[in-house]
Amino acid sequence: MNNRERFSSRLGFILISAGCAVGLGNVWRFPYITGQYGGAAFVLVYLIFLVLLGLPIMVMEFSVGRASQKSAARSFHVLEPAGTKWHLQGYACMAGNYLLMMFYTTVGGWMAAYIFKTLTGEFKGLDSDGVAAVFNDMLARPGYMTFWMVLVVLLSFFICSLGLQKGVERITKAMMSCLFLILLILCIRSVTLPGASEGLRFYLIPDFTRFTENGVGNTIFAAMGQAFFTLSLGIGAMAIFGSYIGKDHTLTGETINICLLDTLVAFLAGLIIFPSCFAFGVDPGQGPGLVFITLPNIFNQMVGGRIFGVLFFVFMTFAAQSTIIAVFENIISFSIDLFGTSRKKAVLINGIAIILLSLPCVFGFNIWSGFQPMGAGSTIQDLEDFIVSNNLLPLGSMVYLLFCTSRYGWGWKNFLAEADTGKGVKFPAWARVYVSYILPLIVLFIFIMGYYQKFK
């Protein structure tokens, strides 16, 4: 692409990259493990690992994207030394993006469906068992879930079809702005509930008893894993946005801004969840159960709960949708970079492909529920998530690390020159030994421990 599309503003790049990083884990995992492992004490350890783990790898993804001016499908071809095979990572990146969307679009559909369910008062008068029954009924209906999944896919690809600036950038900027506004409204409501102070104390005051009672090693690994996985690094989802920006600012400074926004969303989500749960005497829990059962049950009991419930699911939909739009943009760019197709044609082909590829995840909860690939009670979604989260993300991050530091790859000097071009925070040159030798070992440790915890 000689006439590479560009973001119209620096803010657009930062918000869209943050939108890609901000996902459902910020809401249904971060607050839970923060409470479990010691509140503010855990957050401090998490932030340290975010700087040590997530930030360097994200800078490398952005650097590869900006230097090559290509998506992950072609970026390694452009930068690798002649005769090497680094470009094989491009195929792994493509597989990772498609696999991620094969289950993420279904969950995005759940969020959109719950806006409608909450708005129409479907939860009114139900007890906790009734609220759980609504969720289980949705999972049992393949046609209903397919409708919402297709709606999410069509809306996202339509936005991408409008172009980078007029579609992706404009809509995502508006979406992220609304997301933060809704977050603030929900936080204010949550912390002013009677009894919310106990939840705030649990969440914000460092508790080194909880920090140590789970085992210091387990606590550190939990912080390490959250810091690594929150940014979805290793499959080129960030690299594409590096290819859409100029060289006015250093990439380390931009990455710091994105990490701060991602952390802010996760932190504010905790300010919604813990005060609310403590105010109503409910165990927060984690995962889909928190979002689709626990919180609707709380909104049921809250004055003005329907309004705040709708706002919450709009926020969750925006969090999911911002990631989906960002990854769809990456998928579209694969077709454009590899085959020279037009944006409209790439949208049409990939839109149909994603809908078809997302159906196994939908069916895995109902008509194909007998297929339990990860053991009793597991679903196709669990398998897809395992392939992406436990394999492609850590191994892909390892490739980016080695590619940017090894003389057999793009090399340290080329990486550092690209990362430091522009004004702003420079990547620390003294960290070469750390990112070349120590950080790959940490990522390898995360990869091995992921398997151990999954199959122990």
Regions found by a protein language model. Give the residues of each.
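Membrane-interface "cap" regions at the ends of multi-pass membrane proteins
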Residues: 1-28, 57-62, 66-91, 246-250, ...
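Inter-helical loop and helix-membrane interface segments of multi-pass membrane transporters/permeases
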Residues: 2-5, 33-37, 67-92, 105-165, ...
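Membrane-embedded translocation segments of transport machinery
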Residues: 2-3, 7, 169, 173-321, ...
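Helix-loop-helix connectors at the membrane interface of multi-pass transporters/channels
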Residues: 4, 108-140, 244-248, 253, ...
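Loop-to-transmembrane helix boundary motifs in multi-pass membrane proteins
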Residues: 6, 12-14, 20, 142, ...
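Select transmembrane alpha-helical segments in multipass membrane proteins
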Residues: 6-17, 42-45, 84-98, 146-152, ...
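Transmembrane helix-boundary motif of multi-pass solute transporters/channels
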Residues: 11-49, 198, 236-242, 253-256, ...
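C-terminal membrane-solvent junction of multi-pass transporters and transport-like membrane proteins
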Residues: 89, 94, 339-353, 385-443
